[in-house]
Protein backbone atom coordinates (compact mmCIF):
# COMPACT_ATOMS: atom_id res chain seq x y z
CA UNK A 1 0.00 0.00 0.00
CA UNK A 2 1.27 3.48 -0.85
CA UNK A 3 2.11 6.00 1.86
CA UNK A 4 0.55 9.27 3.00
CA UNK A 5 3.37 11.18 1.31
CA UNK A 6 2.70 9.25 -1.92
CA UNK A 7 -0.92 10.38 -1.72
CA UNK A 8 0.01 14.06 -1.66
CA UNK A 9 2.62 13.64 -4.38
CA UNK A 10 0.13 11.82 -6.62
CA UNK A 11 -2.74 14.25 -5.95
CA UNK A 12 -0.68 17.46 -5.97
CA UNK A 13 -2.21 18.90 -9.13
CA UNK A 14 -5.72 18.18 -7.88
CA UNK A 15 -5.13 20.21 -4.73
CA UNK A 16 -3.66 23.08 -6.74
CA UNK A 17 -6.55 23.05 -9.23
CA UNK A 18 -9.11 23.10 -6.41
CA UNK A 19 -7.59 25.67 -4.09
CA UNK A 20 -5.77 28.31 -6.11
CA UNK A 21 -9.15 29.65 -7.23
CA UNK A 22 -11.03 28.95 -3.98
CA UNK A 23 -10.82 31.84 -1.52
CA UNK A 24 -12.88 30.20 1.24
CA UNK A 25 -10.08 30.63 3.77
CA UNK A 26 -9.23 34.25 2.91
CA UNK A 27 -11.31 35.77 5.76
CA UNK A 28 -9.56 33.47 8.25
CA UNK A 29 -6.15 34.50 6.96
CA UNK A 30 -7.09 38.17 7.27
CA UNK A 31 -8.25 37.62 10.85
CA UNK A 32 -5.03 35.72 11.60
CA UNK A 33 -2.90 38.66 10.46
CA UNK A 34 -5.06 41.05 12.46
CA UNK A 35 -4.38 38.94 15.56
CA UNK A 36 -0.65 39.23 14.95
CA UNK A 37 -1.04 43.00 14.71
CA UNK A 38 2.26 43.75 12.96
CA UNK A 39 3.11 45.22 9.60
CA UNK A 40 4.69 42.60 7.32
CA UNK A 41 4.81 39.81 9.92
CA UNK A 42 6.98 36.76 9.31
CA UNK A 43 4.63 33.79 8.90
CA UNK A 44 5.21 30.05 8.57
CA UNK A 45 2.70 28.21 6.38
CA UNK A 46 3.16 24.77 7.93
CA UNK A 47 2.08 21.88 5.69
CA UNK A 48 1.62 24.43 2.92
CA UNK A 49 0.83 21.95 0.14
CA UNK A 50 0.93 23.55 -3.29
CA UNK A 51 1.27 27.04 -1.83
CA UNK A 52 -2.20 28.48 -2.38
CA UNK A 53 -2.59 29.93 1.13
CA UNK A 54 1.07 31.01 1.11
CA UNK A 55 0.17 33.04 -1.96
CA UNK A 56 -2.77 34.68 -0.20
CA UNK A 57 -0.78 35.45 2.94
CA UNK A 58 1.88 37.18 0.84
CA UNK A 59 -0.75 39.21 -1.01
CA UNK A 60 -2.06 40.29 2.41
CA UNK A 61 1.40 41.63 3.30
CA UNK A 62 3.08 38.80 5.21
CA UNK A 63 6.64 37.60 4.71
CA UNK A 64 5.90 33.92 4.12
CA UNK A 65 7.93 30.74 4.48
CA UNK A 66 6.23 27.51 3.38
CA UNK A 67 7.08 24.02 4.60
CA UNK A 68 5.73 20.68 3.36
CA UNK A 69 6.87 17.07 2.93
CA UNK A 70 5.44 16.59 -0.57
CA UNK A 71 8.03 17.14 -3.30
CA UNK A 72 5.38 17.35 -6.01
CA UNK A 73 3.23 19.87 -4.17
CA UNK A 74 6.28 22.04 -3.52
CA UNK A 75 7.22 21.95 -7.20
CA UNK A 76 3.86 23.55 -7.95
CA UNK A 77 4.22 26.00 -5.06
CA UNK A 78 7.65 27.17 -6.22
CA UNK A 79 6.58 27.49 -9.86
CA UNK A 80 3.52 29.56 -8.98
CA UNK A 81 5.20 31.62 -6.26
CA UNK A 82 8.90 32.10 -7.12
CA UNK A 83 9.15 35.00 -4.68
CA UNK A 84 8.17 32.83 -1.67
CA UNK A 85 10.65 30.67 0.25
CA UNK A 86 9.61 27.00 0.39
CA UNK A 87 11.26 24.06 2.17
CA UNK A 88 10.73 20.32 1.75
CA UNK A 89 10.56 18.88 5.25
CA UNK A 90 8.34 16.78 7.50
CA UNK A 91 6.67 18.80 10.27
CA UNK A 92 7.97 16.19 12.75
CA UNK A 93 11.55 17.20 11.93
CA UNK A 94 13.07 20.26 13.57
CA UNK A 95 12.94 23.44 11.50
CA UNK A 96 14.50 25.82 14.02
CA UNK A 97 17.08 26.69 11.38
CA UNK A 98 14.35 28.65 9.57
CA UNK A 99 14.34 31.22 12.36
CA UNK A 100 11.58 32.73 14.49
CA UNK A 101 8.07 33.59 13.29
CA UNK A 102 5.36 36.02 14.35
CA UNK A 103 2.69 33.55 13.33
CA UNK A 104 2.08 30.00 12.12
CA UNK A 105 -0.74 28.81 9.89
CA UNK A 106 -1.36 25.07 10.11
CA UNK A 107 -4.36 24.21 7.96
CA UNK A 108 -5.24 20.50 8.24
CA UNK A 109 -1.60 19.80 9.07
CA UNK A 110 -2.35 17.72 12.17
CA UNK A 111 -5.04 15.50 10.65
CA UNK A 112 -2.59 12.64 10.13
CA UNK A 113 -1.04 12.83 13.62
CA UNK A 114 -1.85 11.39 17.01
CA UNK A 115 -0.12 10.46 20.26
CA UNK A 116 3.55 11.37 20.55
CA UNK A 117 3.68 12.59 16.95
CA UNK A 118 1.04 15.21 17.74
CA UNK A 119 3.00 16.36 20.79
CA UNK A 120 6.20 16.56 18.74
CA UNK A 121 4.46 18.63 16.07
CA UNK A 122 3.37 21.21 18.66
CA UNK A 123 6.82 21.18 20.30
CA UNK A 124 8.36 22.03 16.93
CA UNK A 125 5.87 24.86 16.42
CA UNK A 126 6.63 26.22 19.88
CA UNK A 127 10.35 26.19 19.10
CA UNK A 128 9.96 28.77 16.32
CA UNK A 129 6.93 30.85 17.34
CA UNK A 130 7.80 34.08 19.12
CA UNK A 131 6.33 34.74 22.60
CA UNK A 132 2.69 35.80 22.17
CA UNK A 133 2.92 34.75 18.51
CA UNK A 134 -0.30 33.57 16.86
CA UNK A 135 -1.16 30.05 15.68
CA UNK A 136 -4.10 29.44 13.35
CA UNK A 137 -4.95 25.75 13.70
CA UNK A 138 -7.50 24.07 11.42
CA UNK A 139 -8.60 20.51 12.16
CA UNK A 140 -11.63 18.21 12.29
CA UNK A 141 -13.23 17.81 15.68
CA UNK A 142 -14.33 14.39 16.89
CA UNK A 143 -13.04 10.91 17.70
CA UNK A 144 -13.09 9.21 14.30
CA UNK A 145 -10.00 7.78 12.60
CA UNK A 146 -10.17 6.93 8.89
CA UNK A 147 -7.46 4.37 8.15
CA UNK A 148 -7.09 4.52 4.36
CA UNK A 149 -7.82 6.77 1.39
CA UNK A 150 -8.47 5.80 -2.23
CA UNK A 151 -7.46 8.15 -5.05
CA UNK A 152 -7.64 7.20 -8.74
CA UNK A 153 -8.36 3.60 -7.71
CA UNK A 154 -5.15 3.43 -5.65
CA UNK A 155 -5.29 2.79 -1.89
CA UNK A 156 -3.09 4.82 0.45
CA UNK A 157 -2.16 4.30 4.09
CA UNK A 158 -3.32 7.77 5.09
CA UNK A 159 -4.70 7.89 8.61
CA UNK A 160 -7.12 10.80 8.89
CA UNK A 161 -7.50 11.66 12.56
CA UNK A 162 -10.24 13.74 14.16
CA UNK A 163 -9.20 15.55 17.37
CA UNK A 164 -10.88 16.85 20.51
CA UNK A 165 -9.92 20.28 21.78
CA UNK A 166 -8.96 18.72 25.11
CA UNK A 167 -6.48 16.35 23.46
CA UNK A 168 -5.00 19.20 21.45
CA UNK A 169 -4.44 21.33 24.55
CA UNK A 170 -2.89 18.34 26.30
CA UNK A 171 -0.54 17.74 23.36
CA UNK A 172 0.41 21.44 23.39
CA UNK A 173 1.95 20.85 26.83
CA UNK A 174 1.32 24.37 28.09
CA UNK A 175 3.13 26.03 25.19
CA UNK A 176 -0.04 27.52 23.70
CA UNK A 177 -3.15 29.21 25.05
CA UNK A 178 -6.56 29.18 23.35
CA UNK A 179 -7.65 32.63 22.18
CA UNK A 180 -10.67 32.45 19.90
CA UNK A 181 -12.77 30.21 17.68
CA UNK A 182 -13.82 31.51 14.30
CA UNK A 183 -16.98 30.39 12.50
CA UNK A 184 -16.53 26.75 11.56
CA UNK A 185 -17.85 24.48 8.85
CA UNK A 186 -19.36 21.15 9.97
CA UNK A 187 -16.63 19.36 11.95
CA UNK A 188 -13.83 21.60 10.60
CA UNK A 189 -12.69 23.97 13.34
CA UNK A 190 -10.73 27.20 12.96
CA UNK A 191 -9.06 28.12 16.24
CA UNK A 192 -6.56 30.78 17.29
CA UNK A 193 -3.91 30.07 19.91
CA UNK A 194 -1.03 32.18 21.18
CA UNK A 195 2.46 31.16 22.31
CA UNK A 196 2.69 31.29 26.09
CA UNK A 197 6.23 30.32 27.03
CA UNK A 198 9.53 31.84 26.04
CA UNK A 199 10.75 30.59 22.67
CA UNK A 200 13.69 28.20 22.70
CA UNK A 201 15.40 30.16 19.90
Language-model regions: role of each:
Residues 47:
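Conserved S-adenosyl-L-methionine
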Residues 114-115, 129-130:
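Helix-to-beta-strand junctions that scaffold the AdoMet/dcAdoMet cofactor pocket
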